[in-house]
């Protein structure tokens, strides 16, 4: 795993938080995470990068956070960093013998746990596109349908329901006072906290 490159230091261009809709899309942040050994995660990232609706939600979330509320960014750069941090931590824990929730309770694989963590990280703040207040609950509302659209290309209906439920649990667990009940949810909560404050805090993994 030493040759894997996790992008945990992406920085937004000025265009990412200013300009017309077309300008913002032209300066699109491409989602990526080391996924060559996980075909399911690879497919998920491919679908995410082809989804203009999802990218628009990230842009709207960032406008509310940065331009209207003066907060740190909650858009595509933030979720990309959180995803890379979360997947990296999950792999380190898996290598140390820690069992994921989907493995413990459903006999699913570490690759499935990576899908849970990646999509929870990517969707945890989409509710900011509506409002900061109660954004975690809004994120659940938005993510429910978006996850169905993405996961139907990766899982059969039975497994899709379980994976979607695990992702939604991880999303709601990142709220203040939230209680993660799975390894995956805990990892996403920590990864979100690590990408913090203005200027961002970074943990070097390489």
Regions found by a protein language model. Give the residues of each.
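Amphipathic alpha-helical interaction surfaces
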Residues: 85-88, 92, 149, 193-196
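Post-HExxH zinc-binding segment in Zn-dependent metallohydrolases
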Residues: 146-157
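Short, conserved phosphate-binding/catalytic loop or strand-edge motifs used
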Residues: 117-119, 140, 163-169
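Histidine/acidic-rich helix-loop-helix segments that form or flank divalent-metal centers
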Residues: 104-108, 156-206
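Acidic/His-rich, divalent-metal-binding segments that scaffold phosphate/diphosphate chemistry
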Residues: 3-135
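Amphipathic alpha-helical interaction segments
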Residues: 81-84, 121, 138, 166, ...
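Post-HEXXH active-site segment of zinc metalloproteases
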Residues: 132-145
